[in-house]
Amino acid sequence: RICYLAPRDTQICAPGQEICYLKSWDDGTGFLKGNRLEFGCAATCPTVKPGIDIKCCSTDKCNPHPKLA
């Protein structure tokens, strides 16, 4: 699987990691900064705490930055 690890950087995931994910959350820095983002690969869709959004998918490059998609 090939997943984004940053807005424009991709990586071939390790064996067994067939899920790409994009986590987003408000870090409390205010309107101008917006949400924080975390991109990655995983074996299963990660569990997140309340207030954190996560999108998981299972095709190559399926977790792009929302503004670059």
Swiss-Prot record:
Q: Could you list the residue ranges forming a coiled coil in this record?
A: none
Disulfide-bonded cysteine pairs: these are C3-C20, C13-C41, C45-C56, C57-C62
Classification via SUPFAM superfamilies: Snake toxin-like (SSF57302)
Q: Where in the cell is it found?
A: Secreted
Sorted alphabetically, the Gene Ontology cellular component annotations on this record are: extracellular region
Where on the tree of life does the source sit, at the highest rank? Answer: Eukaryota
Secreted recorded as keyword: yes
One matching Pfam family is Toxin_cobra-type
Q: Give the record's keywords alphabetically.
A: Acetylcholine receptor inhibiting toxin, Disulfide bond, Ion channel impairing toxin, Neurotoxin, Postsynaptic neurotoxin, Secreted, Toxin
Tissue occurrence? Expressed by the venom gland.
Alphabetized InterPro entries for the sequence: Snake_3FTx, Snake_toxin-like_sf, Snake_toxin_con_site, Toxin_cobra-type
Q: Which GO terms describe its molecular function?
A: acetylcholine receptor inhibitor activity; ion channel regulator activity; toxin activity
Mention any additional remark.
Has the length of long neurotoxins, but only 4 disulfide bonds, as short neurotoxins.
| Annotated family | Belongs to the three-finger toxin family. Long-chain subfamily. Type II alpha-neurotoxin sub-subfamily.
Q: What does this protein do?
A: Binds with high affinity to muscular nicotinic acetylcholine receptors (nAChRs), whereas it binds with a low affinity to neuronal alpha-7/CHRNA7 nAChRs.
What protein am I looking at? Toxin Lc a
Source organism of the structure: Laticauda colubrina
